[in-house]
């Protein structure tokens, strides 16, 4: 009798440990992919962008704000560790069932590592004043010379639906900022009014996104050969690449929506607590 009980317990334990082991293996695979993508450096740059954006918000909406207090608030909102955690959780969930190994193999290769480094360097360079204008000048020069890289950039944009995904992400972030303002008591706009205001921004957001994205991609990928860019494009045309693209957008959009809401709440709190 005791033998049967032991056997039953062993079977139950076995059925419990298999999913746990699979989850641990999956987590390790995703950890390796995040490392190959250098996610922490990406988030660190976004953290710096957030600090700058917070300062701009203060200048535009709260010129008389206590900047020491506001800067401390912005630093708490754009906490890099929390930002990374948000992205990791969402991307990991979205990649459930997708092939991870081919992605890690590519991004851990010499070419993949170089592409990641070029993308990060380009994004960090855009933190410098005047860099966006420099990128647009470079884009104009490339267009006049009809450089082959431009056609490949168009292919990357089209294959991964980069403009539409970025536009929708930006609009959703703006929506969450409005909701933060309302929930914080700084605005009495209803949901219909908020949605109307956000949709009015669509054309401007789309134009800005198109301009920024093409300049950024040119700066990032111009050092690569046509063959290198084609190999990268082929990765994102594959099933694992499409899954990663969708998961990354979902992860970063989730992060930005939460940050935007918190930023709206923070603005509301500072505005409503300001002395008359």
Language-model segments: residues:
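Acidic/His-rich structured neighborhood in mature extracellular/periplasmic domains
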Residues: 73, 77-167
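Second-shell loop/turn segments in exported
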Residues: 36-43, 71-78, 87-91, 102, ...
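A cross-kingdom marker for long, charged
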Residues: 203-276
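Bacterial N-terminal signal peptides that target proteins for export
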Residues: 1-7
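Extended amphipathic alpha-helical interaction segments
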Residues: 123-222
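N-terminal mature-domain "stem" immediately C-terminal to a signal peptide or N-terminal signal-anchor/transmembrane
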Residues: 22-61
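Acidic/histidine-rich, surface-exposed loop or edge segments in extracytoplasmic proteins
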Residues: 64-73, 82, 86, 212-214
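C-terminal segment of classical bacterial N-terminal signal peptides
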Residues: 13-20
């Amino acid at each position: 009798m005791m033998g049967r009980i032991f056997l039953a317990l062993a079977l139950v334990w076995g059925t419990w440990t298999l999913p746990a082991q699979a989850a641990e293996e999956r987590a390790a695979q995703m950890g390796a992919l995040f490392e190959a993508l250098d996610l922490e450096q990406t988030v660190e740059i976004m953290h710096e962008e957030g600090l700058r954006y917070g300062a701009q918000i203060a200048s535009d909406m709260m010129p008389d704000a206590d900047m020491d207090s506001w800067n401390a608030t912005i630093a708490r909102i754009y906490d890099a560790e929390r930002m990374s955690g948000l992205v990791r959780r969402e991307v990991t969930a979205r990649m459930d069932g997708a092939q991870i190994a081919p992605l890690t193999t590519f991004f851990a290769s010499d070419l993949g590592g170089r592409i990641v480094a070029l993308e990060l360097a380009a994004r960090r360079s855009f933190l410098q004043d005047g860099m966006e204008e420099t990128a647009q000048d470079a884009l104009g020069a490339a267009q006049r010379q009809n450089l082959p890289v431009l056609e490949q950039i168009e292919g990357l944009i089209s294959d991964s639906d980069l403009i539409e995904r970025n536009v929708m992400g930006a609009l959703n972030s703006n929506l969450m900022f409005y909701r933060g303002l309302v929930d914080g008591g700084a605005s009495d706009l209803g949901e219909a009014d908020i949605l109307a205001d956000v949709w009015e921004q669509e054309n401007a957001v789309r134009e800005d996104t198109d301009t920024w994205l093409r300049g950024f991609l040119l700066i990032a990928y111009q050092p690569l050969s046509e063959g290198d860019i084609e190999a990268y494009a082929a990765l994102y045309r594959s099933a694992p690449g499409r899954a990663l693209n969708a998961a990354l957008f979902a992860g970063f959009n989730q992060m930005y929506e939460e940050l935007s809401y918190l930023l709206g709440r923070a603005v509301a709190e500072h505005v409503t607590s300001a002395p008359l």
